[in-house]
Structure formats: C-alpha cells, structure tokens
C-alpha cells in the first residue's frame, strides 16, 4: 500500500467532512486561508459561471476561438486538432488562439491516466517501453473502443513517460493545467479485474502505480498549475473525496447514472452532498450534465418552444446551483465533439448561449437547505427549487 496516499486520503476526508456544516455562511470567504488560488480561473456570481469541455479534429476557426474566449475555464479533450498533426499540436494551437483573445482564460490539457487514445505524439515513445501496455491473464491486450489499449502505470518507466508528456505541455505558457481522466477505471476493481480480465497481481500493481503517480503529480505540478481530475462519483465509498487532496478539484460527469442497486434519487442525493463538501473547501467544480435527450425532442435547440429542453436545462441548472460555491462552473452538454468524422455538427449547442446564462444571478445568500429529496437555495436574483425524486427544477428569476 502507498502509505503517503493512505494518510493523505484520511486527512482529506476529515477536512472535507468538516465543511458539511457551514456556520456563519459567507460565500466570499469560503476559501480564506487555503492559499494557492492565484492559479485558479476567474470567477463571478454575476451570471451562472460557465465551463467548456470540447474537442475538434480540425483547427478551430477564428469565430470559434472568439466564442471559446468567453469561458473562464476550458478543457481541450482527446482528439483535439489531430488533423493539425497531433493532440499536443492541436491543443497548443487552440490554446494560443484563445489566449490571444483572453489572456485570463485558464486552459487545461487532457491527460488520461490509463488509456492511450490515438492521435497523441507521445504514443510513439510509449511503444518503445517494454511491457508498457496492460495485458489480461491470457496474455491478450484489453482494449476500449475495440483497438485502443491501456498503458500500465504500475511500471516506473510508464509513469516517467506520462509525466514527461504532461510536463512538456505544462511548460508552454498557453497551458494552465491538466485534467486527468479515467481515474474511476482504476479505482473500481470490477473494470479491470472482471471486465478486462486482468490478473490480481497486475491490477494491484496498477493501483499502487496510480498512487505513486498521484504523488508525483502533486509534488511536481500543483504549485504552479491547475490539476483537475474526473474523480467525484457517488458510486465510490467516499464519493472520491478521499483523493481530492491530490487535485485542485473535479470534473463531473455521469452524475445521474446510478449503479450498485442504489435508487436514482439516493444516488443523486449522495452526489450532491459529495460535491457540496468539495466545493465548500474551495475546490474547482467543473459540472457537466447532459441535455441530449431533451434536444432530441420538440424543436431541438429552440429553447423558447422546446418544452423538454426548457425543463431539462432548468433542472440541470438547479442541480448545479444547489452545489455551487466559488470556483464552480457549469456546462450543460449535448456532446464534447464539435463535428462528426463526416463533418456534420455533433454539438447542437456549439456557438450558442442558453438564456439562463444571460440572466443576473448574484451571490448565494446561504447554503442549500434539504428536506427529503427537495432542495432550495436563495441567490440575490434567483430562487432555486429542486426535486431530485421527480427530476424537476424551478428557477425563479427577479
């Protein structure tokens, strides 16, 4: 066991748990005394704070860069700019384009913790490392998306390779940090042990390597860079809070996808409690919630006439506002990719601004209150009412 990881996790859980009771609530002072916030994105309660998470194989147009420059926090996902040459080249080109328009925007480079997604300039070097790719018990190489393999961070050389690529990107002034994905695949043992048929010893080595890699990332990168992870999930015993000591915050997805026999309302309620604990300690929250199904109904992206879209956007925004604190950002998402391989628009909200982001919000007057599955919260210009059992949210603007 990685003892440094174990003890840091215990301290993190204790600190985060202590934040659940906010006496003398003041949203402007929740981060006081924590330090290290100079590297964080700009934040304002004037309107609902926005996050952007996107990829596009081709280069972004000038108009698209103008649009992206509006966001305080942006992650350029895997496949960004692969038609430019590599993910690294494409990410840097996009980041520099945004920075010329908005130097204050914070831009994150996407790094997967175990998956060697195609298009990366670093993959060539990985292939030269003996045993770099994870094998199943029968000697085969497990994959995701049919052909994409997993690298073995249980090996010191693979961890060094991972750090080298991250360091090279973080050394560029246009990159402000990294977003680390697929942590859940390492932490939920059923994925590698049962789905991918990896042996017990190999899996334990992978988990030990994960702890060692987090320690390296924390020591070498976090002083000057934002380090986010896809780490908060209600399915985990502590919701992922026991790992947040290694990160500046969490990207959130699959928030409503209940597993393990837990009811959907209870799963969402645990997620809310977990995110609140993290946000109240000044962690960055990049909250994504899907609205694809609502867009498929009615009149698509016409917010005024599509009742399903209107209801879904209000519900997801209410979920966000119930958990939000300073450095929380919201992204209602249709898709991360801008266009399909065939060149068709894949994200129907691309280059659009939903009406809720144009309304004045104002600072929260206090934390959310909870009564069963009903949550309420008051902001200067908005009253939030949320029912997670019936999945209804109401925003009353004034």
Task: Give the role of each language-model region.
Residues 1-10:
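Bacterial N-terminal signal peptides that target proteins for export
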Residues 25-398:
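Glycan-processing catalytic domains of CAZymes
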Residues 9-18:
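Bacterial N-terminal signal peptides
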């Amino acid at each position: 066991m990685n003892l440094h990881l174990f003890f840091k996790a215990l301290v993190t859980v204790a600190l985060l748990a202590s934040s659940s009771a906010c006496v003398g609530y003041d949203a402007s002072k929740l981060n006081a005394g924590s330090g290290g916030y100079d590297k964080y994105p700009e934040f304002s309660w004037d309107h609902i704070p926005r996050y952007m998470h996107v990829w596009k194989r081709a280069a972004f147009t000038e108009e698209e860069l103008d649009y992206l420059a509006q966001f305080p926090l942006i992650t350029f996902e895997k496949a960004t700019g692969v038609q430019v040459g590599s993910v690294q080249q494409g990410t840097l080109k996009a980041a520099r384009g945004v920075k010329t328009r908005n130097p204050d925007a914070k831009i994150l480079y996407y790094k997967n913790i175990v998956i060697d997604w195609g298009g990366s300039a670093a993959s060539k070097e990985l292939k030269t490392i003996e045993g770099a790719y994870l094998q199943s018990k029968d000697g085969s190489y497990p994959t995701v998306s049919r052909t994409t393999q997993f690298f073995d961070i249980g090996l010191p050389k693979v961890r060094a390779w991972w750090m080298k690529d991250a360091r090279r990107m973080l050394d560029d002034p246009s990159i402000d940090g990294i977003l680390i994905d697929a942590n859940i695949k390492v932490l939920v043992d059923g994925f590698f042990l049962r789905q991918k048929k990896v042996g017990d010893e190999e899996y334990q080595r992978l988990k030990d390597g994960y702890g060692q890699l987090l320690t390296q990332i924390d020591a070498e990168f976090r002083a000057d860079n934002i380090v986010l992870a896809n780490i908060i999930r209600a399915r985990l015993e502590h919701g992922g809070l026991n790992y947040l000591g290694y990160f500046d915050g969490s990207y959130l997805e699959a928030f409503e996808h209940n597993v393990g026999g837990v009811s959907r309302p209870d799963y969402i309620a645990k997620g809310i409690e977990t995110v609140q604990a993290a946000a109240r300690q000044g962690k960055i929250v990049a909250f994504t919630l899907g609205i694809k199904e609502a867009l498929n109904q009615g009149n698509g992206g016409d917010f005024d006439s599509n009742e399903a879209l209107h209801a879904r956007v209000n519900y997801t925004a209410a979920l966000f506002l119930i958990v939000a604190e300073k450095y929380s950002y919201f992204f209602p998402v249709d898709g991360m990719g801008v266009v399909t391989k065939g060149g068709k628009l894949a994200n129907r909200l691309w280059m659009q601004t939903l009406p809720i982001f144009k309304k004045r919000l104002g600072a929260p007057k206090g934390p959310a209150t909870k009564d069963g599955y009903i949550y309420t919260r008051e902001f200067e210009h908005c009253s939030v009412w949320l029912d997670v059992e019936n999945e209804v949210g109401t925003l009353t603007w004034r």
